[in-house]
């Protein structure tokens, strides 16, 4: 019996859910070349505008000269280089925690943390809109797995009453497709009241949130006692690649011993850690980046309201324009692209059925003129949305 892959692919295409990879032919930034076309992009996660920063590039080059271009082995063999260790110490300082542990990417950090902490006989409770990596981690952990209603503390508490064994409450800090933030103070209170631990994946909060860019935990003034497990990624606001988990001495040592995605993989290039150390320095010292980004977010929301666009309740750089139908979302994305703007249409299964959207993301590298151009073009294109649309998707 053969695998009928063609039928699956045809069904996805017919539902306007077929995904294709745009080919980036320039460095990351607001001005890009995609599939040969110059475009103004509003769809990357380089929130602080550091992915193509000359000082970060120079740090990578110097790191490669000093340390070479490969990690060479896993961290537990001979792949844990001095730059890796220095970056872990810097990330621990940023988060105000005793230790931090580097992972190769955010998916591996989430999978490693959850599966190392809970298993059969334990409980994982997750927000239903968590990132796919967190949901996969919960399912793969072998623990009793349940999802509570989005940002709904009462729904969480009802599930906490039925939890068994060690219980891990897991949430995004900033929800990647909606842009809203978790009610961490309430989640922390509920978890602590039942003796559960709270784990936060703050992939999209580091950089934009907090007085020093230390994310949602800093934003709310919470402690390690409130949020014992804190995850961050380095491929967004830090402008490089990788991820980390920050927490207590015991937590990090537990992950080193039991987190299989950490143990059984080659370390990242040491030069990458050198680059990230530089971007971390810029993130902590160049506060104008957060201030400028905040102004751009406010500008976009004011303008979108005047146009009559339906936005989500978000004060973060993630500003989704709700469309509903996947075909209509693709059509609006195509209309913008024809006018030189790149904004990705997000469709199921990434978001729930009937909630397709254009996911606008803003960066400190954008200018006020860039945002105004986006608003002007949206005002032109939105009335055209109900015209016949192409069945060929152009983005994810």
From Swiss-Prot:
One GO MF term attached to the UniProt entry: 8-amino-7-oxononanoate synthase activity
EC primary class: transferase
Name of a matching Pfam family: Aminotran_1_2
Cofactor: pyridoxal 5'-phosphate
Superkingdom of origin organism: Bacteria
An example Gene Ontology biological process: biotin biosynthetic process
Positions of modified residues (N6-(pyridoxal phosphate)lysine): 236
Annotated InterPro entries: Aminotrans_II_pyridoxalP_BS, Aminotransferase_I/II_large, AON_synthase_class-II, AONS_Archaea/Proteobacteria, AONS_Proteobacteria, PyrdxlP-dep_Trfase, PyrdxlP-dep_Trfase_major, PyrdxlP-dep_Trfase_small
Binding site for pyridoxal 5'-phosphate: 106-107, 176, 204, 233
Keyword Transferase listed: yes
Residues that hold substrate according to the record: 19, 131, 350
Pathway assigned to this chain's UniProt record: Cofactor biosynthesis; biotin biosynthesis
Record's keyword annotation contains Transferase: yes
Key words, A-Z: Biotin biosynthesis, Pyridoxal phosphate, Transferase
Listed PANTHER family: 8-AMINO-7-OXONONANOATE SYNTHASE (PTHR13693:SF100), CLASS II AMINOTRANSFERASE/8-AMINO-7-OXONONANOATE SYNTHASE (PTHR13693)
Function per UniProt: Catalyzes the decarboxylative condensation of pimeloyl-[acyl-carrier protein] and L-alanine to produce 8-amino-7-oxononanoate (AON), [acyl-carrier protein], and carbon dioxide.
Quaternary structure note: Homodimer.
Family: Belongs to the class-II pyridoxal-phosphate-dependent aminotransferase family. BioF subfamily.
Name used for this protein in its record: 8-amino-7-oxononanoate synthase
Lineage of producing organism: Bacteria, Pseudomonadati, Pseudomonadota, Gammaproteobacteria, Pseudomonadales
